[in-house]
């Protein structure tokens, strides 16, 4: 299959072609969240099974996507976008708080969003791994996005006199790896802790990066 089939145009059932297409795409993504994120998983799902779960035909699948990998790619981006929206809102809401409280609020928002549905965790940290060079590039790009966000918040803390002045990119990259690994393990039941305890541990790690031993805020 070299390309998507053309979807019908015109109004039908009170909906435009674009509205019907968006609805079909949503149904395929919702079905993929269930099949990829729960059982049987991305690698064991077929186009026919996904179409059946969505209540649509395989022909309609090929009107929206070329391959199942395209569906996984779209779903991975969507799950990350949901988490980003939660973090951006938390950053705005916590802007007036001291650094420790601000960091806790931001990471609590991220963790709550990602772990609110175990299927999201599996899409983000499990199913995306090792599929193809294209999806590995996408995964690394999304990780770089989170590194950029941590660096931006660290630099804001520096500007406020709340953190040491330094290049945070390497530390942020390592920290994001810790976040991903700890949340994955917690969700899998391998970590005997509450989500609040996980967030508190991550905040302690972040504060240790931002305020290394011996650092003191500049006296104005």
Model-derived regions: residue spans:
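C-terminal peripheral helix-coil segments that are non-catalytic and often amphipathic
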Residues: 1-11, 112, 116, 148, ...
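Alpha-helical DNA-contacting segments of helix-turn-helix folds
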Residues: 20, 65, 69-82, 86, ...
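Generic hydrophobic, amphipathic alpha-helix propensity
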Residues: 20-32, 50, 75-83, 150
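Helix-turn-helix
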Residues: 27, 35-70, 74
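Hydrophobic alpha-helical connector segments
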Residues: 74, 88-116, 175, 199
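Amphipathic alpha-helical packing segments from all-alpha helical-bundle domains
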Residues: 85, 133-159, 169-173, 181, ...
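Secondary-structure edge/capping motif, primarily at the C-terminal ends of alpha-helices
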Residues: 90-94, 124-128, 186-190
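Short, structured motif recognition centered on aromatic/hydrophobic residues
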Residues: 123, 179
């Amino acid at each position: 299959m070299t390309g998507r089939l053309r979807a019908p145009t015109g109004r039908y059932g009170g909906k435009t072609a674009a509205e019907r297409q968006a609805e079909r795409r949503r149904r395929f993504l919702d079905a993929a969240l269930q099949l990829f994120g729960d059982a049987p998983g991305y690698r064991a799902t077929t186009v026919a099974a996904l179409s059946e779960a969505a209540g649509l035909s395989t022909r309609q699948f090929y009107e929206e996507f070329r391959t199942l990998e395209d569906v996984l790619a779209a779903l991975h981006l969507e799950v990350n976008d949901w988490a980003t929206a939660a973090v951006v809102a938390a950053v705005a809401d916590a802007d007036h708080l001291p650094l420790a409280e601000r960091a806790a609020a931001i990471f609590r928002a991220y963790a709550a969003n990602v772990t609110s549905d175990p299927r999201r965790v599996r899409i983000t940290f499990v199913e995306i791994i090792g599929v193809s060079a294209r999806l590995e590039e996408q995964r690394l790009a999304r990780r770089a996005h989170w590194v950029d966000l941590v660096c931006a918040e660290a630099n804001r803390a520096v500007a406020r006199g709340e953190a040491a002045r330094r290049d945070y990119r390497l530390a942020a990259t390592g920290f994001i790896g810790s976040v991903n690994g700890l949340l994955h393990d917690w969700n899998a039941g391998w970590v005997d802790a509450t989500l609040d305890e996980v967030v508190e541990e991550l905040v302690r790690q972040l504060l240790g990066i931002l305020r290394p031993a011996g650092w003191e805020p500049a006296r104005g």
